[in-house]
Amino acid sequence: MGPVWLWLWLLVAEVLLPVHCQPFSAHGDKSLGASQPASHQSLEPAPAYHKVTPTITNFALRLYKQLAEEVAGNILFSPVSLSSSLALLSLGAHADTQTQILESLGFNLTETPAADVHRGFQSLLHTLDLPSPKLELKLGHSLFLDRQLKPQQRFLDSAKELYGALAFSANFTEAAATGQQINDLVRKQTYGQVVGCLPEFSHDTLMVLLNYIFFKAKWKHPFDRYQTRKQESFSLDQRTPLRIPMMRQKEMHRFLYDQEASCTVLQIEYSGTALLLLVLPDPGKMQQVEAALQPETLRRWGQRFLPSLLDLHLPRFSISATYNLEEILPLIGLGNLFDMEADLSGIMGQLNKTVSRVSHKAIVDMNEKGTEAAAASGLLSQPPALNMTSAPQAHYNRPFLLLLWEVTTQSLLFLGKVVNPAAG
């Protein structure tokens, strides 16, 4: 009998809604990389998620660069979603396969043993899942196992304890009905934002590992829809203009201009513990900015942001992206996961079970009532005073990068590039 397959399917969704909020507080209270105020709690051990979040960021930047070489258009994915699913899968891997998965994510297993990695993800997922009145962030893992299988109880127990993964019995010989059941679960868990997400699978599928992350936030400073201009120009490249709706506001935001990377970086806050970085390359400098995307660059930006009144122009758009990553992940070290040498016997107690597909889907929606990303143009100076008539203009009218962070854990929830805001 030929090999039977396990699938890893991930999806993410974002929806951002309006809020009439309190006056803007001091900009020092929420920032990427900001240190916590000194208190008696500073003597307590650091949360376990600190052992994984820097590695997730590094993994995300490496994966982004590979995607940028392969994809000409919009890019969007969730580093937390993808890395946590691969780490969960490693629970059922043995020997070299487990080592390969975790090391490909960027973990030094001598410094951070596998047990500490899993406890770090447990801490991260638990913290992100804590209820918040101003930010809704819902993550989940589900395992769909063929009903003929006898999965290892140790794997199921660890997956539930560390990753909150719930296991379901499935009949993959009835592919259409089972696919509908899984899609119904996803639609319910993402409040109808993701519909019909699951790709077709064959009758010899044994397992589907599904991850979802649903992000719902409110702008700290919502846009006035009456200020939106319906037909402003967005440059797909230096020769091709596109007419799109452009939102506008004058508000306080943090920003900087990075001469080394040739880009403008704008930080926009949400209510709650999330913020968005919008990175606008100078004309013709996108590849230079992408090459400069390193953890050190992000730390430098976090230290240099200054608050200023800005005349901000952001596109209104909705984009999605879907990837089959089985050709991309081997380029960052995950090769054996997709061949018969992979040892995933910790899941089902059998060898010769391999992963056939890693699918990842992300959705982002941005409008006046709540925004998540924007298109690019730059701020080249910082004003000496809050003068409404002389506020510098941040006009996002060409391709740009977006990085969406949860501040408490310093975790990168979404990373992407908006090339065409009208691509859908």
Curated annotation (Swiss-Prot):
Residues 1-21 form the signal peptide. InterPro entries: Serpin_dom (IPR023796), Serpin_fam (IPR000215), Serpin_sf (IPR036186), Serpin_sf_1 (IPR042178), Serpin_sf_2 (IPR042185). It is found in: Secreted. Disulfide bonds: none annotated. Keywords: Glycoprotein, Protease inhibitor, Secreted, Serine protease inhibitor, Signal. The keyword Magnesium does not apply. One of its GO terms (cellular component) is extracellular space. Glycans are attached at N108, N171, N352, N387. Pfam families: Serpin. Its main location: secreted. The keyword Plastid does not apply. GO terms for molecular function: serine-type endopeptidase inhibitor activity. Gene3D superfamilies: Alpha-1-antitrypsin, domain 1, Antithrombin, subunit I, domain 2, Serpins superfamily. Belongs to the serpin family. This is Serpin A11. The gene is Serpina11.
